[in-house]
Amino acid sequence: MKMKLVTAAVMGLAMSTAMAATDATSLATDKDKLSYSIGADLGKNFKNQGIDVNPEAMAKGMQDAMSGAQLALTEQQMKDVLNKFQKDLMAKRTAEFNKKADENKVKGEAFLTENKNKPGVVVLPSGLQYKVINSGNGVKPGKSDTVTVEYTGRLIDGTVFDSTEKTGKPATFQVSQVIPGWTEALQLMPAGSTWEIYVPSGLAYGPRSVGGPIGPNETLIFKIHLISVKKSS
């Protein structure tokens, strides 16, 4: 994290210099256009991350360093400033993450409390909920068996985060190699069945951030069609 932030800061100095020295209406050379494009891209990233900097001061620092002029801050002062910046940014990110995790947990619990009273919804001791859409008559898989499924995963607000429809082909995997909510549900499903399962965060990814739309402590919904089961030898 530290090296990434330092690298970003150094790049920022270079890019803001290029932007300050180049009028956006007179990008005559490829070098001008490249410099401007990289600077604009970095500026967007800084804005999206909430990093507040002074472009003029960044440009001045780069110019002084490249020209060999006396720097306005000592090496130790600059190191201290960057270290504080990194520490403050990490604290901010952690606070934002924890707030989001708490919000998702509360929303997920409220959803499950309401959902369990809906017609056809079954609640298991683990907290996993499911509803049978179509009941198959095939074999039920065990933990070590391999299954082939079609599925769509979405958040409780309806956002689809994954689906076999995107790839156009079903997914095949061992029952024990997925999130606990899936492992539990699959072992109850006869092949040929289609279920909708409602997975509490503790049976999904928990407080971890897995990227994409799935945040920490997310309750997840999956529509699963169990196509086939291959028993382990």
Swiss-Prot record:
Activity regulation statement: Strongly inhibited by FK506 but is completely resistant to cyclosporin A.
Main location: membrane
GO cellular component, one term: cell outer membrane
Superkingdom assignment: Bacteria
EC number(s) per entry: 5.2.1.8
Family from the record: Belongs to the FKBP-type PPIase family.
Name of the protein in its database record: Outer membrane protein MIP
Source organism of the structure: Legionella pneumophila subsp. pneumophila (strain Philadelphia 1 / ATCC 33152 / DSM 7513)
Phylogenetic lineage: Bacteria, Pseudomonadati, Pseudomonadota, Gammaproteobacteria, Legionellales
Gene: mip
